[in-house]
Design a protein with these regions (language model features):
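PRPP-associated nucleotide enzymes
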Residues: 1-362
């Protein structure tokens, strides 16, 4: 299947070679204010720019986990990429654990933020609007053991364009993984060029794209991010060996009724704990729960993006965040904004603007 799309800044030709699901179920097209790449594939199954149900999330996680070889040498190290793929990757990790309960494994995700007291491996994401990110090295003794003795490495992102980010991360990891035998790449959509040098790549869709700019792409003004450190919340930056469980206190004050429409919002890269919260909420109250997140991604109002608003920087790092496709006339009965640290002024203001409830997950 081959289609050509006219975007605000140019022309995109998209060829789909293989798809496990109809492409229209996986993504739609958007445009963004980024001269490195002026378009984006707006995922319909991630819970970032587009709301997704918890049932859809679970289905996608299980499909991707099942694509990995059945007999990966253990310990298996799973790494998810910030900002966009943190919930996808941790969901895949948990689905894989359920499929292989006897295997030793460890999950980590990269971060745009520094955790206080933890050593990091820096690397760059070449096409991103926020190129710098870090992988934190585990502190817990058992997590360190599984990390340093890992024999299989699984790198997970939502989309693969060139493979350069995975290569940069793998190069940074090489001195720390002396026992490594196998590497696998896992993603929703694989648009990387075919190369014999790449590890096995498992995806739900394989294709190619070619973009021809027709003029200068809109440019987002550069942001001077403040150098801050955060406390670790124990949800993945420093490693986790099991499926995430939230405390009962997170659900103690719920007044949601069966049949109501509820939007659960994550904050930037903090999305998997809100996904777990959304799943638990759906099971407990029988409401129609949708998941989405604020994001640093500077998209334009075009195509799959029908509405855009500035949103809280939950970490006070001076970074603009955005929330997409939640217009003033939205049809949700409740909105819950989930966050990992005590709410700052910006989060309280965003909650007030949406008449939303703030939930600190523990």
């Amino acid at each position: 299947m081959k289609r050509t799309h006219i975007l605000p800044g140019g022309q995109l030709t998209l060829s789909i070679d293989r798809a496990d699901l109809p492409p229209d179920e996986l993504f739609a097209l958007g445009a963004r204010a980024n001269p490195r790449r002026a378009f984006l594939f707006v995922s319909k199954v991630l819970g970032k720019h587009w709301p997704v149900t918890t049932a859809t999330l679970a289905r996608i996680h299980q499909m991707l986990a099942a694509k990995l070889p059945a007999a990966l040498p253990a310990p298996v190290l799973f790494i998810g990429m910030a900002e966009t793929a943190t919930a996808l990757a941790q969901g895949v990790f948990e689905a894989w654990l359920a499929q292989h309960p006897q295997q030793e494994a460890l999950y980590l995700h990269t971060s745009r933020l520094r955790v206080a007291g933890a050593a990091v491996l820096p690397f760059e994401e070449s096409h991103s609007h926020a190129a710098q990110q870090w992988l934190h090295l585990p502190i817990d003794a058992e997590n360190r053991r599984r990390f340093s003795t890992a024999r299989s490495l699984v790198l997970i992102d939502d989309e693969l364009s060139t493979g350069n980010t995975f290569r940069a991360l793998a190069a940074a990891l090489t001195p720390h993984l002396p026992a490594l035998q196998e590497t696998h790449w896992l993603c929703l959509t694989d648009f990387s060029p075919p190369t014999s040098a790449a590890p096995p790549c498992h995806s739900l869709l394989r294709g190619q794209w070619h973009y021809r700019a027709s003029g200068k792409a809109p440019l987002t003004p550069p942001v001077r991010e403040r150098a801050i450190t955060i406390a670790d919340s124990g949800h993945g930056r420093l490693g986790i060996r099991h499926a995430l469980q939230l405390s009962e206190a997170c659900f103690a004050d719920s007044t949601i009724k069966a049949g109501e429409r509820v939007l659960v919002l994550g904050s930037g890269e903090y999305l998997h704990p809100p996904a777990v919260y959304a799943r638990e909420l759906a099971q407990r109250c029988g409401a129609d729960i949708y998941l989405q997140s604020s994001t640093r991604s500077p998209a334009l109002v075009w195509g799959a993006i029908s509405h855009k608003r500035r949103f809280a920087d939950p970490y006070d790092a001076g970074v603009p965040y955005y929330l997409y496709n939640v217009p003033p006339d939205h049809r949700y009965d409740h909105i819950h904004i989930c966050h990992e640290h005590p709410a700052n002024t910006a989060l309280r203001e965003s909650a007030a603007a949406l008449s939303a409830k703030l939930i600190q997950l523990t």
